[in-house]
Design a protein with these regions (language model features):
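Single conserved hydrophobic/aromatic residue that forms the stacking wall/gate
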Residues: 1-6, 248-256
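Structural motif
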Residues: 3-45, 58-98, 129-172, 201-243
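Active-site-proximal loop->helix
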Residues: 53, 103-107, 130, 180
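Conserved loop->alpha-helix
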Residues: 53, 244-249
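A generic, well-ordered mixed alpha/beta core segment in the N-terminal half of proteins
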Residues: 86-118, 125-127
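Flexible, glycine/charged-enriched surface loops at secondary-structure junctions
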Residues: 115-118, 188-198, 233-240, 254
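Short, conserved phosphate-binding/catalytic loop or strand-edge motifs used
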Residues: 121-132, 198
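Aromatic- and glycine-enriched pocket-lining scaffold segments that form the walls
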Residues: 170-183
Length: 256
């Protein structure tokens, strides 16, 4: 697996590597699967962040600890706020409690949700009291983290009137926002992102769908260097495909 440790001196002349699904795509589709329970996911990421999110969604306890998983903290905060008449406390590691989440909390509260700080204002841990939103438009500064934007965009189809998100300031990590919109469109949700405006229509149900997460080819870049620096090493990379077949890429002994 891509998470295994490979030491150069212990490598054989031929190695096989299986690539798991993209973490970014996996985390987004997991939230949507919790909203629309007729989504089946193939090739889910094996990353710690995705495992934490998946476990938390399948075991919605009153106290949720995401450890170091930053994406889980942000996506879960938005999702849990929509679960009416339920109360949650979401926390993480000491390092997680130093990572700001104020912009997302302010946006959720401005929509009518109920999210409170338990310690330092602007930072986890949080108390979330699931409720119904009162408004369908929010202004969000987008220069800090695109994950705040994606967190709101992912819950938007479950809201009675959908959601309009007006982005202020420079939009960072725009490709990740585009990814979120693309996934929504792929499962049948009407969502658009034009200039500084995201518009997501309310969606009560979607057609049954089998969602294949793209393999995380970016994680393979480290192994390219390993092959280039190791004599007589061949590496076969297996990529998940819809027909349960695999594509094998055999790298040359030297890339230099």
């Amino acid at each position: 697996a891509a998470s295994d440790v490979y030491k150069r001196q212990n490598l054989k002349s031929y190695c096989e590597l299986d690539i798991s699904g993209s973490k970014s795509e996996s985390n987004r589709i997991l939230i949507l699967k919790s909203i629309f329970n007729n989504i089946k996911i193939n090739n889910l990421s094996s990353s710690d962040d995705t495992s934490v999110l998946n476990h938390s969604l399948q075991n919605l306890n009153e106290n949720i600890d995401v450890g170091h998983a930053g994406t889980s903290m942000r996506f879960l905060t938005a999702y849990l706020a929509t679960l009416e008449n339920k109360k949650f406390i979401i926390s993480g590691s000491d390092r997680m409690h130093q990572r700001p989440i104020g912009l997302l909390v302010d946006a959720l509260n401005s929509l009518g949700f109920k999210v409170n700080y338990l310690k330092k204002r602007g930072f986890p841990p949080l108390e979330i009291i699931g409720s119904k939103n009162l408004h369908h438009e929010v202004v969000l500064k987008s220069h800090i983290s695109s994950q705040f934007v994606s967190a709101l965009t992912l819950i938007a189809p479950s809201l009675d009137n959908g959601l309009r998100i007006i982005l202020q300031d420079d939009i960072i990590s725009k490709p990740y926002i585009n990814m979120t919109i693309s996934i929504l469109n792929k499962i049948g949700v009407d969502a658009t992102f034009e200039k500084n405006l995201i518009n997501v229509k309310p969606t009560k149900k979607i057609n049954d769908i089998i969602y294949d997460v793209e393999s995380d080819w970016s994680s393979v870049s480290y192994f390219f260097s390993m092959v280039a620096l190791t004599k007589n090493l061949k590496l076969s990379i297996s990529d998940y495909k819809k027909a349960v077949s695999y594509t094998h890429l055999t790298l040359p002994t030297r890339l230099l």
